[in-house]
C-alpha cells in the first residue's frame, strides 16, 4: 500500500486534541473521516506529536497508507475539500517509502509559545495566545531559560501522568523573541528538541512567566530543575498559546 506524509495546520480550539476520541472531536478523527470519503476504510493515521486540547499546529506531520496511488497535490486538495468547514488544512502531501514513520522517523520537533502582555483582553488573537495583564522582563526570562538548555532530568517540568519511560531529555534550543505591538508586547518562546515530555513546554513557559513577572528569580529555575519534583514547578501555562511549528527528519519528505 502506498504511504503518504501529510503536513498539517490546525486551530486546536474546537478539538479535544490530536488523538481520536470516542465521543469528542479530534484532529485525527477529522482527517481519518476525510480519508474515508476518498477510499474505503477504516483509516488510521500516525502523527509526529499528539497535541493536547486547545493546542495548535502549523507544521504537524502525519502519515497514512492508501489503497491506490495518488498524485500528492490532488490528495491534499481532495482532503481539504472534505475537511471543510473544520479549521484543519493539509498544507502539503508527499509519497514516502513504506519505512517512513511520522513519529519514529522524526529527529526534531519545534514548538512556539505566544505570551502576550497587555491589560486589555485580546480580541483578534483570542484563543491563540496566553494573555497576562502585567509587564514582563524578557532578560530575566532569558536568564531563567538558559538553565534549561541541554540534557537534563526534566521531572519537575513534566505532567504527573506523563508516560515517557525516562524524564531525561535534551532541550537543544530555547530562545525568546520580543515583538512590540501598538496594543501590547508579545513574547514568543521557540523550543527545539528531538522529543518532549507531556506538558514540558507549557510547564517551562509557565515557570518563565513567573520569572518575567518578578515572582521568581532566574536562579530559582535551576533550583526547580535540580529538585526533580513536580511540586517545584511553576504554574502550567494554558494550551492556547502553544503551536507545533515543525518536525525534522533525516531527509525532508516534502522537499
Curated annotation (Swiss-Prot):
One of its GO terms (molecular function) is tRNA pseudouridine(38-40) synthase activity. Belongs to the tRNA pseudouridine synthase TruA family. The lineage of its organism: Bacteria, Pseudomonadati, Pseudomonadota, Alphaproteobacteria, Rhodobacterales. The keyword tRNA processing applies. Keywords: Isomerase, tRNA processing. It comes from Cereibacter sphaeroides (strain ATCC 17023 / DSM 158 / JCM 6121 / CCUG 31486 / LMG 2827 / NBRC 12203 / NCIMB 8253 / ATH 2.4.1.). It catalyses: uridine(38/39/40) in tRNA = pseudouridine(38/39/40) in tRNA. This is tRNA pseudouridine synthase A. Homodimer. SUPFAM superfamilies: Pseudouridine synthase.
Amino acid at each position: 500500500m502506498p504511504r503518504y506524509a501529510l503536513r498539517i495546520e490546525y486551530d486546536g480550539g474546537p478539538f479535544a486534541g490530536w488523538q481520536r476520541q470516542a465521543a469528542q472531536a479530534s484532529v485525527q478523527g477529522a482527517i481519518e473521516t476525510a480519508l474515508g470519503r476518498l477510499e474505503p476504510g477504516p483509516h488510521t493515521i500516525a502523527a509526529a506529536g499528539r497535541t493536547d486540547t486547545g493546542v495548535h499546529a502549523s507544521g504537524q506531520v502525519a502519515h497514512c497508507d492508501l489503497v491506490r496511488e495518488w498524485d500528492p497535490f490532488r490528495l491534499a486538495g481532495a482532503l481539504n475539500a472534505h475537511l471543510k468547514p473544520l479549521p484543519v488544512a493539509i498544507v502539503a502531501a508527499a509519497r514516502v517509502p513504506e519505512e517512513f514513520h511520522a513519529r519514529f522517523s522524526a529527529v526534531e520537533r519545534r514548538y512556539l509559545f505566544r505570551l502576550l502582555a497587555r491589560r486589555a483582553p485580546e480580541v483578534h488573537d483570542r484563543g491563540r495566545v496566553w494573555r497576562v495583564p502585567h509587564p514582563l522582563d524578557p532578560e530575566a526570562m532569558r536568564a531563567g531559560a538558559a538553565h534549561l538548555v541541554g540534557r537534563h532530568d526534566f521531572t519537575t517540568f513534566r505532567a504527573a501522568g506523563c508516560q515517557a519511560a525516562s524524564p531525561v531529555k535534551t532541550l537543544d534550543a530555547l530562545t525568546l523573541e520580543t515583538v512590540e505591538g501598538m496594543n501590547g508586547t508579545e513574547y514568543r518562546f521557540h523550543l527545539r528538541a528531538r522529543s518532549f515530555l507531556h506538558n514540558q513546554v507549557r510547564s517551562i513557559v509557565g515557570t518563565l512567566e513567573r520569572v518575567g513577572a518578578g515572582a521568581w528569580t532566574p536562579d530559582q529555575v535551576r533550583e526547580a530543575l535540580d529538585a526533580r519534583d513536580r511540586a517545584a514547578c511553576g504554574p502550567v501555562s494554558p494550551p492556547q498559546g502553544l503551536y507545533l511549528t515543525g518536525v525534522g527528519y533525516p531527509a525532508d519528505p516534502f522537499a
